[in-house]
Amino acid sequence: MSTAKQNLSVQRWVAAISVLLLAVKFIAYYSTHSVAILTDALESIVNVAAGFIGLYSLFVAAKPRDQDHPYGHGKAEFLSAAIEGTLIGTAGLIIIYKAVQNLIHPVELHKINYGIWLIAVTACLNFIVGYFCLRTGKRNNSLALIASGKHLQTDTWSTVGIIIGLVLLYFTGYKWIDSTIAILFALYIIYTGYKILRTSIAGIMDEADVKLLSLLVEVLNTNRRENWVDLHNLRVIKYGTVLHVDCHLTVPWFLNVHEAHKEVDALGILIRKEFGESLELFVHSDGCLPFQCKICNKTDCPERKNNFEKRINWTLENISQNKKHELK
């Protein structure tokens, strides 16, 4: 099964289970009238909406690139995550509003022990599904699955906190505990929504992934070949599960086209080995210039004009510049 199809299959399960958990949580709310349980139920509405939005985005992202979308449809995942983050934040605000109302005008609570058991079951299911979703998303580089997994895990921990609060309420009878729990976890939900939204906007705006670039630079330095005289103008863009890498690779000027292409192929094989097969590599090969002899450690070079002095270590700062490197 391809990565895109696997992502789609997992998201189908997420959407289906979210509907089931939503029903269970609303049964618990109508049985107890607890605003803390309502907090959980409202977030489950977001889970359902986000699950189906994520499902659609993965369906779109799985489409092959076409004439209108030469880089594919991967950015649909970023849009999905942005909507999900917004929905999570909105749910948090609604929960705070409802909790404050209940602090001012308390309502009678019923069957708290019954509600505790129901939402405990949903917490267990959420944790299992969220863990599997997050693991698959990280393995397949799917932002939509990662967002869904984080969302479900957040829901799990908030449910656990709500259960603890409801147990205290059950034994003490203090009604204000119900609303206080709801407000605390609503703030946590809003924070989670912000983080998901921030990540998705970074993807939409093609913000540089510093962690990914740093790892790539480390891999290139460690596995540097003798004919890779220099590397510059390195850029990485991620569209869904596909990584697009482009750079300028300087090779000895006397290599023929076939030999230069072998060096480009070696670069592609190295990056795919470390980052997976979902990769598009665009490399512009440059011939070396006399001033670069000082940074070239090729031992059998027949055209050397200057003695080798020092190999320049590639860093995040110098490898991204559109400029050939030289010793000052």
PLM segments and residue spans:
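Alpha-helical transmembrane segments and adjacent TM-loop junctions that form the membrane-embedded core
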Residues: 2-17, 24, 30-42, 46-328
